[in-house]
A protein has these predicted regions:
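FIC/Doc superfamily catalytic core
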Residues: 1-36, 42-50, 58, 62-502
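Conserved two-metal-ion catalytic palm core of "right-hand" nucleic acid polymerases
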Residues: 54
């Protein structure tokens, strides 16, 4: 007779088979797994119930942690809709635009349109919900490749977006408008449905972002077909510079986010001290901050490091081949010291006149390599693991913000460094440089430390002192980052950093 351990192992083997088939396991009852295995996995924390009869894969001990749900969220929506509604469903035009624009925040409510809709709201985990609305959908929908979601085609989504969307989600709306190469697809939707009111709104939207050619084409073509088109601008403001056509939504999104946030940072931040004349004196002050900075920066990320351990690795009394080989905290502390020295070198270049954005663009791969080199020394990581940005998806524990997918990271990072290079205000470079770095999350691990290094390199470019984010303010600091990521409000994060700058 099998032991309990053997039975548990058999159930886990069934779960493993499912995980080999799907990136994220979403189960409807016993359709894909036997009742006994389902119950055993659920009772032992390897599955969590989303709603009656629906489950997602989890890990024991993660009960109450939102990360599993946010990680599984869109996969669940796609599978639930496919099972319940077949192929005749899609997200609303507004939520389709969210996804086209690269918005990665998990919404409080998803609204699906389908002829089979029942107009009822289904409560899901952690105060999220799903409304399946009875409605006709576009003749053809776009199958989004990441999660398998059905979306409005981009042009049709722009035409049928609610007027309010252009005011509440102006970054997403403008990002999607900039993805349209010419007026043809928009006009096909408008002329097919005789949508003269919508034509006036979408023409005004294109004119708002500076695309006069598409705006004029929409108006003239619709009027040529006899429609009374009265152009109106659905936005409440104008972008500072015209937007150009971009295949990648992340390029436009990041530029618009920067434009939207920078003035608030300038308003809240103390005036920059200015150029540092005594470069060596400034670098000595950076050296004096090392121990304090290492303790707090590593503690923020959950590592157990003592002042004694930090001093041990600083003076070189660290022997990875001996007693510290399995001591992860020691490896991390040593890596932090090596990375800190690399950042110090970058700051030296900046203080001697190198453009701060160009300096960090060139040197941040070296910071990252030094941060993890001790793990290569002891054989935990390979050298190739430290080259380039991540190739897999990463999630932030407890956050509604889902970092960019690996392909998007490669689109986004050059934009970040261009923004840093061309930004005239050092406080904006510091606050937004840090925030955008962790928003993108270009590495599998160490993004918080890297973001704080970016912060201090940019602070140095304005003559501000090296600034430590204390672990005692971790909750406030993380909450402010979350608000900026999810709501687009940078004010709390700017206030936190401004209050720490001395």
């Amino acid at each position: 007779m099998a032991t309990m351990a053997e039975k548990m192992a058999a159930s886990l083997e069934e779960l493993r088979k499912l995980q080999e088939k799907d990136r994220c396991v979403v189960l409807q009852g016993t359709a894909e797994i036997g009742r006994t295995h389902l119950t055993r996995l659920l009772d032992n924390g390897w599955l969590q119930e989303v709603m009656k009869g629906w489950y997602i894969a989890a890990r024991p001990g993660t009960e109450g942690d939102t990360t599993i749900w946010y990680t599984s969220f869109w996969y669940f929506i796609a599978k639930y809709a496919a099972v319940r509604l077949g192929e005749r469903w899609c997200l609303t035009a507004d939520q389709s635009l969210d996804l086209y624009s690269g918005k990665t925040t998990v919404p409080v409510q998803v609204v699906i349109k389908s002829p089979k809709g029942h107009n009822n709201t289904q409560k899901l985990m952690y105060d999220t919900s799903l409304l399946v609305f009875q409605s006709e959908i576009p003749d053809q929908v776009y199958k989004e490749p990441e999660y398998g979601l059905n979306l409005y085609p981009l042009a049709e989504a722009l035409v049928y977006a609610t007027p309010r969307y252009f005011q509440v989600e102006k970054i997403a709306a403008r990002t999607c408008l900039a993805m349209i190469r010419d007026a043809a697809d928009i006009l096909k939707v408008l002329t097919k449905n005789g949508a003269s009111l919508r034509a006036g709104r979408i023409a005004g939207a294109f004119r708002n972002i500076g695309n006069i050619e598409i705006a004029d084409s929409i108006v003239s073509t619709m009027r040529g077909f006899g429609y009374d088109v009265r152009e109106e601008d659905p936005f409440e403001d104008q972008p500072r510079t015209p937007l150009v056509y971009e295949v990648s939504p992340y390029v436009t999104r990041l530029r618009l986010m920067w434009e939207n946030m920078r003035d608030k940072v300038v308003e809240l931040f103390p005036e920059a001290p200015g150029k540092i004349d005594d470069v060596e004196g400034y670098l000595r002050s950076v050296d004096e901050k090392y121990s304090e900075d290492a303790y707090h920066s590593l503690s923020i990320e959950g590592y157990r490091v003592s002042p004694e351990l930090i001093e041990k690795v600083r003076v070189g009394n660290w022997k990875p081949e001996e007693e510290d080989k399995e001591h992860k905290n020691a490896l991390v502390a040593r890596g932090y010291y090596q990375a800190f020295q690399a950042v110090r070198g970058t700051i030296s270049d900046i203080l001697k006149g190198k453009n701060a954005g160009e300096a960090v663009r060139a040197d941040h791969p070296v910071w990252y390599m030094q941060m993890w080199m001790p793990f290569v020394t002891v054989g935990i990581l390979q050298r190739e693991d430290l080259v380039g940005y991540r190739t897999g998806q990463v999630y932030i524990r407890g956050s509604q913000h889902i970092p960019l997918n690996p392909k998007a990271v490669r689109d986004a990072m050059p934009v970040l460094f261009d923004l840093l290079k061309n930004e005239p205000h050092p406080a904006v470079r510091a606050v937004l440089g840090h925030f955008f770095f962790v928003y993108i999350h270009p590495y599998m691990d160490g993004n918080g430390r890297m973001g704080r290094f970016v912060l201090n390199a940019m602070l140095a470019s304005g003559g501000y002192n090296w600034t430590v984010v204390p672990v005692e303010r971790r909750k406030e600091y993380m909450k402010a980052l979350e608000k900026a990521s999810v709501e687009g409000d940078i004010s709390e994060f700017a206030k936190v950093i401004a209050s720490l700058v001395k």
